[in-house]
From Swiss-Prot:
Purpose of the protein: Mitochondrial ribosome (mitoribosome) assembly factor. Binds at the interface of the head and body domains of the mitochondrial small ribosomal subunit (mt-SSU), occluding the mRNA channel and preventing compaction of the head domain towards the body. Probable inactive methyltransferase: retains the characteristic folding and ability to bind S-adenosyl-L-methionine, but it probably lost its methyltransferase activity.
GO terms assigned for molecular function: 4 iron, 4 sulfur cluster binding; metal ion binding; mitochondrial ribosome binding; S-adenosyl-L-methionine binding
Disulfide bonds listed in the record: none
Spans through the membrane: none
Localization per record: Mitochondrion matrix
Keywords: 4Fe-4S, Iron, Iron-sulfur, Metal-binding, Mitochondrion, S-adenosyl-L-methionine, Transit peptide
Species of origin: Homo sapiens
Annotated protein name in UniProt: Ribosome assembly protein METTL17, mitochondrial
KW Protein transport (keyword) present: no
Similarity comment text for this entry: Belongs to the methyltransferase superfamily. Rsm22 family.
Primary location group: mitochondrion
Subunit structure: Associates with the mitochondrial ribosome (mitoribosome).
Annotated binding of [4Fe-4S] cluster, by residue: C333, C339, C347, C404
Gene: METTL17
Amino acid sequence: MAAALKCLLTLGRWCPGLGVAPQARALAALVPGVTQVDNKSGFLQKRPHRQHPGILKLPHVRLPQALANGAQLLLLGSAGPTMENQVQTLTSYLWSRHLPVEPEELQRRARHLEKKFLENPDLSQTEEKLRGAVLHALRKTTYHWQELSYTEGLSLVYMAARLDGGFAAVSRAFHEIRARNPAFQPQTLMDFGSGTGSVTWAAHSIWGQSLREYMCVDRSAAMLVLAEKLLKGGSESGEPYIPGVFFRQFLPVSPKVQFDVVVSAFSLSELPSKADRTEVVQTLWRKTGHFLVLVENGTKAGHSLLMDARDLVLKGKEKSPLDPRPGFVFAPCPHELPCPQLTNLACSFSQAYHPIPFSWNKKPKEEKFSMVILARGSPEEAHRWPRITQPVLKRPRHVHCHLCCPDGHMQHAVLTARRHGRDLYRCARVSSWGDLLPVLTPSAFPPSTAQDPSES
């Protein structure tokens, strides 16, 4: 016990923002018998455990009334009898969408199929027949990605399908920034792929007192018109509910003007190639003054492209001579190491929300999404507490938490008051999927080998 406490105190001098302590790369185990709640700053400050600073999940999110009224007015004036079916079809299509297959991957698959056909002695192959067989097999086994062109009609369907869920996901991301950095008061925001303008509304709900300029960029003219109507309560005239909103169809490439917050929500997946995504992420980071917020569907495809964007920024390939400050991961990762979940389940989160009260909507709903928030500066500025990556499983006298730890590893922790201390146990019990657990996870401790306690 004394040796463990000495090790904990020694490790406390290691700056948690700088990554893994130099002693070892072992799993960040929650060691029984050692109180590891991060008390160095008196984090509870006489508050109850249910209000510990790692709690970040929002209650049910609701659209601003002006936005909900505008959406209902637009839909009542334009929707046909098949709107419900169109909404369901588009929702399913967007959720199940994969990334476009890159040319190099297509060539690799074609060579593999050609080799497979040539190895079959029962097939007499001419060069023309072989080429036809390979193409036929490729068409059957390759995802056919198509670019969506948002006309006036499709933009309206998208609004009915995604306005409320998109607002909920972005609100959760913005809430994390505000909760962990309450002194941050942005004045400018740029939204790439702005669509219906849900990012602008979510940002106004969080930082409406400080934001003075919102730049909305979307290549669809019809979508920009729809977003502007929503700002005016669903009409083409009148004063916008949020002042200082500007619309344009093309992304400004000049790095001279930066925005305090830059956002891309459900837009990187709409780009036709990895090269296009790389170019856009580089441009977005150059335009970022403080925070770059990227949000996508909580699927393997969405998580994968967000990790590509994260790695691109962290490797520093897009450094601008006008702003040489490095980037670090503000959320959700408590580290800058490779994602330990990339080969398994998608790292996703869930936000409950009240949908727009259309006839087909049921209450409440959950928006499942993946996100990454990148910030300029030093990792020392961010919390390095473990992130809860799955729903917390509460059982009598113990609780299961799946954690992404600051050393870049996943841990399934089974916590009890007797083995881990009352503070840590109570904090874990009141925490939810997506929260931070205010606990020190020194990598010098060996992984816990204790078995899960009986659930009887």
